[in-house]
């Protein structure tokens, strides 16, 4: 195997992540990929927005970094279980190979979710750049494109799951954050695993309001910002 090829690693909660030798970076926290996604994006992103906006749907989500597909799959499950329609727009300039995504073990992490296992591969196998419903409550558009080039739609929740500022600094600077902020609906939130001071400063400069929220296991902090209603 080429030493520069992505490879699967196991994180502390037993779930897989993908390590990229080229960047010396993994797609998820080494402390637990599965629980990080649930904590940052489902609990403090989707659930928090929904608690403030019950009855308002469809929920429009924009994700920076489809990656392993874990956030999308967990959101699909949430939409089905809550019977709330979700429009999910995600970008990924460098999709994983079939060899990698078929070996990921996320569908084995919770035996109560086995009904949804088939959707994980369907998320990866579906065509790029074409939006379509995957279930009665989950419509997704995956685009093989960069944040710089994507055309954004109005959004209620932003899952900002890019590689770290040390690896992709341009994604965390004000010009691209402002592009996202402009697309956010009043009352929308922005969540990410990153808690860097310069990120928070940039978000505040865009007139977003920051929360003090705890990080996922293994991390003291994360970042959540709200757009004023």
Where are these regions (language model features)?
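S-adenosyl-L-methionine
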Residues: 102-152
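Conserved beta-strand/loop positions that form the S-adenosyl-L-methionine
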Residues: 62-64
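Class I S-adenosyl-L-methionine
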Residues: 196-229
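Conserved beta-strand signature within the Rossmann-like core of class I S-adenosyl-L-methionine
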Residues: 157-159, 184-194
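A short glycine-rich, Lys/Arg-flanked "PGG" loop and its adjoining helix->strand segment in the class I
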Residues: 170-186
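A short SAM/SAH-binding and catalytic strip from SAM-dependent methyltransferases
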Residues: 156-171
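Glycine-rich SAM-binding Motif I of class I
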Residues: 69-73
């Amino acid at each position: 195997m080429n030493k520069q090829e992505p490879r699967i690693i196991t994180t502390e909660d037993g779930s897989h992540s993908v390590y990229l030798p080229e960047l010396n970076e993994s797609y998820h926290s080494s402390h637990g990929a599965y629980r990080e996604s649930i904590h940052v994006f489902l609990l403090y992103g989707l659930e928090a927005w929904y608690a403030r906006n019950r009855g308002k749907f469809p929920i429009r989500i924009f994700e920076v970094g489809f990656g392993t597909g874990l956030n999308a799959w967990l959101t699909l499950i949430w939409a089905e279980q809550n019977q709330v329609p979700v429009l999910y727009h995600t970008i990924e300039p460098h999709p994983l190979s079939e060899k990698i995504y078929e070996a990921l073990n996320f569908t084995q992490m919770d035996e109560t979710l086995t009904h949804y296992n088939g959707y994980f591969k369907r998320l990866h196998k579906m065509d790029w750049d074409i939006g379509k419903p995957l279930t009665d409550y989950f419509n997704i558009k995956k685009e093989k494109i960069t944040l710089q080039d994507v055309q954004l739609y109005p959004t209620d929740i932003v899952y900002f799951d890019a590689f770290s500022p040390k690896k992709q600094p341009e994604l965390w600077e004000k010009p691209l954050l402002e592009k996202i902020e402009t697309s956010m609906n009043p009352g929308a939130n922005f969540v990410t695993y990153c808690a860097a001071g310069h990120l928070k400063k940039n978000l505040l400069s865009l007139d977003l309001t920051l929360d003090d929220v705890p990080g996922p296991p293994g991390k003291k902090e994360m970042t959540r910002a709200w757009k004023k209603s």
